[in-house]
């Protein structure tokens, strides 16, 4: 008599994987919190996720350094933390206005932070910008802006901080670097190519840092949030049919079922860093997207293309940019110039 075999449906496998992942995450996030008194530097710390992280760490007894471009927003952030009674003392926070896309200013921020508090325990690279619009309407300058803020600012602060993070006193806890990347660094979202390119770069840098520094006393956590209700749409740059682009992005960024609150994200990040996690993905949709793109990259690209075709605005013909550009080639550098014409297809 033959034994009957019960077929396992792919959905059952997926459900099992999700349940197992949730169980592992629960165990990892249930470990004790980090000890108080840490010195935490947060870039982009004046609003959104940066401010939520500042509040979470302040409530744990950390001393804060907040860096951002706008000094008025930094002052407002400090007042918010004081009003919410998150800070134990006004002396526990240092505000450093700076443009971190400038390596010299990033070094100045690190030096002033160490001079003021004596050390840095945790560096959180959170500063970022968003550029939204179809590729036909995105100038090269948009990619340069995104790379400068989303990638090079983190690179500048990391390089400036590394000597301090590596030079720990015997018996001290490991230092930590936290890179706030994005699911956009795992999954190429259409109409956000400057953002996607910069976040892919940051994910690669962050994962490589973890490999190199894990056994040198510096833990690196790569954070890949999905959509969050940060209010970032108010500060995003839109190209193409700007009203339509703003509409779809704002709707997606503020739909509760698709997004996470910044407080929830800050709590997840705090726990991940305290527990030495190498990487976390925030929101179930982002977790699922990251795994699907890893298992079926071609299928994911077809689905993304379909969404672009059916759901997103068409390019603005009036604002189409000249896709060709010129390169001037020398022995030492490659810069924009007029000697060689490169056109699409070459």
Locate predicted features.
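Conserved glycine-rich cofactor-binding loop
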Residues: 46-47
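Active-site helix of classical SDR
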Residues: 158, 198
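Residue(s) in the substrate-gating loop at a strand-loop-helix junction
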Residues: 182
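SDR active-site lid
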Residues: 215-286, 302
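Conserved glycine-rich Rossmann-like NAD(P)H-binding loop of the short-chain dehydrogenase/reductase
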Residues: 60-77
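The beta1-alpha1 cofactor-binding region of Rossmann-like NAD(H)/NADP(H)-dependent oxidoreductases
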Residues: 72, 97-108, 140
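Substrate-binding pocket helix/loop in short-chain dehydrogenase/reductase
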Residues: 134-135, 139-144
């Amino acid at each position: 008599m033959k034994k009957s075999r019960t077929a396992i449906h792919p959905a059952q496998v997926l459900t099992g994987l999700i349940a197992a992942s949730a169980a592992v995450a629960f165990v990892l996030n249930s470990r004790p919190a980090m000890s108080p008194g840490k010195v935490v530097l947060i870039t982009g710390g004046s609003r959104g996720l940066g401010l939520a992280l500042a509040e979470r760490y302040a409530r744990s007894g950390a001393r804060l350094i907040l860096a951002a471009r706008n000094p008025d927003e930094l002052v407002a952030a400090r007042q918010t933390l004081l009003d919410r009674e998150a800070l134990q003392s006004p002396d526990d926070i240092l505000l450093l206005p700076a443009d971190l896309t400038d390596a010299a200013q990033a070094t100045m921020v690190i030096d002033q932070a160490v001079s003021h508090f004596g050390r840095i325990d945790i560096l959180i690279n959170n500063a970022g910008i968003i550029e939204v619009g179809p590729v036909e309407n995105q100038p090269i300058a948009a990619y340069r802006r995104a790379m400068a803020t989303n990638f090079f600012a983190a690179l500048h602060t990391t390089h400036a901080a590394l000597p301090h993070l590596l030079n720990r006193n015997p018996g001290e806890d490991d230092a930590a670097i936290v890179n706030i990347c994005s699911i956009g660094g795992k999954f190429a979202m259409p109409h956000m190519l400057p953002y996607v390119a910069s976040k892919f770069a940051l994910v690669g840098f962050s994962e490589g840092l973890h490999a190199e520094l894990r056994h040198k006393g510096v833990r690196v956590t790569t954070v890949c949030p999905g959509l969050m209700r940060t209010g970032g749409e108010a500060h995003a740059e839109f190209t193409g049919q700007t009203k339509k682009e703003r509409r779809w992005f704002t709707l997606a960024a503020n739909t509760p079922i698709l997004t996470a609150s910044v407080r929830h994200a800050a709590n997840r990040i705090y726990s991940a860093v305290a527990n030495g996690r190498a990487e976390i993905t925030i929101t179930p949709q982002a977790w699922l997207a990251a795994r699907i793109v890893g298992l079926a990259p071609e299928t994911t690209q077809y689905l993304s293309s379909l969404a672009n075709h059916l759901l997103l605005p068409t390019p603005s013909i009036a604002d189409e940019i000249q896709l060709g550009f010129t390169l001037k080639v020398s022995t030492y550098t490659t810069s924009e110039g007029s000697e060689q014409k490169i056109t699409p297809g070459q």
